[in-house]
UniProtKB/Swiss-Prot annotation:
Its main location: secreted. Expressed in sheath and socket glial cells in both the amphid and phasmid ciliated sensory neurons (at protein level). Residues 1-16 form the signal peptide. One of its GO terms (cellular component) is extracellular region. It is found in: Secreted. This is Protein dyf-4. Interacts with daf-6. It comes from the Eukaryota. The keyword Cell inner membrane does not apply. Glycans are attached at residue 64. Keywords: Glycoprotein, Secreted, Signal. Coiled coil: none annotated. Required for the localization of daf-6 to the socket glial channel and the sheath lumen. In association with daf-6, plays a role in dendrite extension and ciliogenesis to ensure the formation of glial channels in amphid and phasmid ciliated sensory neurons.
């Protein structure tokens, strides 16, 4: 949750006001290929709601909003949970004729620097199928630690709400259907800018210029891992590692005064992440959540956005005088998520297979980050 709001904040530059509107163009949920999900959730059951419980189509900062997951179906009993997360930001670096955009994928989680990648204090970098993730070996312990950190911090991100789902247990989760809601208090634009300066130091100046356009897309890759036995803690693993013990305890008998200074904590966390799980560990669920959004400080842009999509105005009390009301007609019926996902996957595979073999980079790009305008130009008979 913390990651999502910080990523949205990354695109903020210098605005004239201390208010900000984030227009949610689309939120999509995809299953990972080759994974049989033991935890299922439908796209329409993943929503952002306001304090009155209404689904929101734009976010007004500052303000309180809740991430609402309904009808999470756990198909079988689970033991201990671990998780992996990777976040890729699609930065528009060039826009050509007919709206064709060439996007630069930038990995934000793990945080990418010129020489390396790194995760936070609770996770280590792992790689699978050419993609990097931050692995949290004890997901429930981390969730509580992060929530405590945010709730007690200066920005008070996690607000207390009577509708929030209490964290009652972190292991031996029974097969059932669950709902989950967590309230987030989004601060003002100036406060978010301060967070950017302290958190987004891995982004170079050129990419920051591109981000200031106010429109973007980012993908969140999530893997949930379950095992019969708990993971090894970071402290326990480091205490038993000859190469990393001095990172954990600089006063250990064989650690001299320089051992701690030359200790590579990121390498040690990566080593721990690769070995922390019990041999019974398996992937229980794998999803990609994709966010397409744009930002503005103009309320008239918000009204236009609502009209274009036939969305109701979730916060009518914020409507400015003499502004026409937004139509509340229902949106046209669209195919189910499963049908759209199956059709999209078939079209993607057919399009990539029809491309000439010399287009290696484009084929790889379209396989990972499907861009209909760009990819379909090279397979018009398919699209």
């Amino acid at each position: 949750m913390k990651t999502i709001w910080l990523l949205l904040a990354t695109c903020i530059h210098v605005f004239a006001h201390d208010e900000l509107y984030i227009l949610i163009d689309e939120v999509s949920l995809y299953n990972c290929r080759g994974v049989k999900n033991e935890i299922t959730v439908k796209e329409e059951d993943v929503q952002i709601v306001n304090e009155r419980g209404n689904r929101v189509y734009y976010i007004r900062a500052p303000g309180n909003y809740s991430l609402d997951f309904k009808k999470i179906k756990v198909k079988q009993n689970f033991g201990f949970l671990a998780g992996e997360i990777g976040v890729t930001l699609q930065v528009p670096v060039l826009e050509g004729p007919a709206g064709i955009r060439f996007d630069l994928p930038y990995t934000m989680v793990p945080e990418t620097t010129l020489l390396s990648q790194k995760c936070d204090d609770f996770s280590g970098v792992i790689e699978r199928n050419g993609r990097t993730y931050c692995r949290y070996c004890d997901l429930c312990h981390v969730s509580q630690a992060v929530e405590n950190e945010l709730a007690s911090g200066r920005h008070q991100f996690l607000s207390q709400s009577e509708n929030d789902t209490p964290i009652s247990k972190c292991y031996n989760i029974e097969s059932n259907e669950y709902d989950f809601r967590r309230t987030i208090q989004l601060p003002s634009r100036s406060q978010l800018e301060g967070l950017i300066r302290s958190k987004a130091q891995g982004i170079d100046d050129e990419i920051k210029k591109r981000l200031n356009k106010g429109r973007g897309r980012f993908q969140v890759f999530l893997n949930l891992i379950t095992s019969d036995k708990p993971a090894i803690s970071l402290n326990r693993w480091m205490a038993g590692s000859k190469d990393c013990e001095c990172c954990f305890n600089r006063n250990a008998p064989h650690c001299d005064s320089l051992s701690y200074l030359y200790c590579n904590m990121e390498d040690c966390k990566t080593g721990w992440a690769l070995q922390c799980l019990h041999k019974s560990a398996k992937v229980a669920a794998c999803y990609t959540v994709e966010f397409n959004y744009r930002m503005t400080t103009s309320y008239s842009d918000v009204l236009e956005f609502l009209r274009e999509n036939n969305y109701p105005n979730q916060d009518s009390q914020y409507t400015q005088p003499n502004q026409p009301l937004v139509p509340t007609t229902r949106r046209p019926v669209t195919p189910s998520f499963e049908a759209r996902q199956a059709n999209q996957l078939q079209m993607t595979q057919a399009c990539v297979e029809s491309m000439p073999s010399r287009m290696t980079h484009l084929k790889r790009y379209c396989t990972i980050f499907w861009n209909e305008k760009l990819c379909c130009e090279h397979c018009p008979d398919i699209c």
